[in-house]
Amino acid sequence: NENDTSPPDGILSLLQRTFARSFEVHPLVSQKLVQQKQQRLRLTNNQMRLLDYINNRRRAAISGGAGTGKTLLAVEKAKRLANDGFKTLLTCYNKQLGMHLESICKGIDNLEVKNFHYLCSSYIQKFKKEMNRDLLQEAKDSYGMQNQFDVLYPVALSYAADSSNFQFDAIVCDEGQDVKQSYWEPLELLLNDYDNGPLYVFFDDNQNIYSREKKFPITEEPFLLKDNCRNTSQIHNLAYKYYKGDWIDPPQNMGAKIMRIHADTLESQVKKINMEITNLITKEKVSPDSISVLLLNGEYKEIYYNIFEGLPLPKPAKLQIEWIQGVNDVLIDTVKRYKGLESEIVFLCGLDGSENGALDDLIYVGTSRAKSLLYLVGKERICNNILS
């Protein structure tokens, strides 16, 4: 047909092969993180119903595995008590967790947030200034030169209860399994109603990496959180291989598979981690503060830190070592110090020594810190052993 302007069959076939090839567009990692965050928010809102259920209880222990929302619920309970007019203390054992809780609760009336030992030291200083009493010296006079953190600080804190100005109407404790038995008495003494003052303890039986005896000043059976609302199911399934306790329902969000970076030396591990972090920030548009590097075994942490400090990150990202993570910070820390916290993406390294089962509790804690994406970094044999 002389009016037919379509290209000849040969040219048409060539055009189709060249321009009509099927291809697949993969969403950026940053986009996946946003989607998974929305899914977690819906699950966490369901967990909040527990707070309504225990609203009329003056004291309660709430138990749950990693990712069940214990810290979020502890913060929300403390905020509700403070908003209801209770002078409230939100406390924990871990220093890093304490700083995190303090930062997200800043400016809330009636709410004081401090980890246990910071609470002790600040009260010792405050009491000396306002009451002209040296509580630490009084503790030394009574108990001699015993361990400052395990004996003298708790004793000094109990002495502070002599003044009603230093007492609270209610106390909420997160990660209660890490609080030593000898710390509970001074905490209870800080309640202006020793017998009936509101006291809520959130804990995880399996995260007791400090090997504390778990006896809380609460007689009723604990309430159990059963839904994992932090991790993907891939991360959940790995972390809960190392969990001993009540069944926790895995999330429905499958998520990405566990990533592995194989390297035999510390230096090569760090270099490969740095390359992948650079890729996540530059190509996948991931915010630096969504990335954390955690050392399972902190024995060689200074070596890791020194190597990391010598490698560049794409600006404005910078490395933050053992401190609060800012908006442009890639954090590096140990699993023990990072306990109770979470990150969208976690690189878990320092895996040496994990094969004999001695670090199983730390593997549970370390892997479960990752919300969306988890990298295992180390010798191939060790990574395979953790995944097997």
Task: Label each region the model flagged.
Residues 1-19:
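Accessory nucleic-acid engagement/destabilization modules that flank
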Residues 40, 45, 51-128, 150, ...:
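Conserved helicase motor core of SF1/SF2 NTP-dependent helicases
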Residues 122-149:
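Conserved P-loop NTPase mechanochemical-coupling segment
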Residues 18, 22, 127, 131, ...:
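Short, flexible helical or helix-coil boundary motifs
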Residues 141-169:
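Mid-core helix/loop region of P-loop NTP-binding domains shared across ATPases and GTPases
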Residues 15-19, 23-24, 47, 207-208:
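N-proximal short alpha-helices
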Residues 20-43, 63:
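Conserved adenine-nucleotide phosphate-binding loops and their immediately adjacent elements
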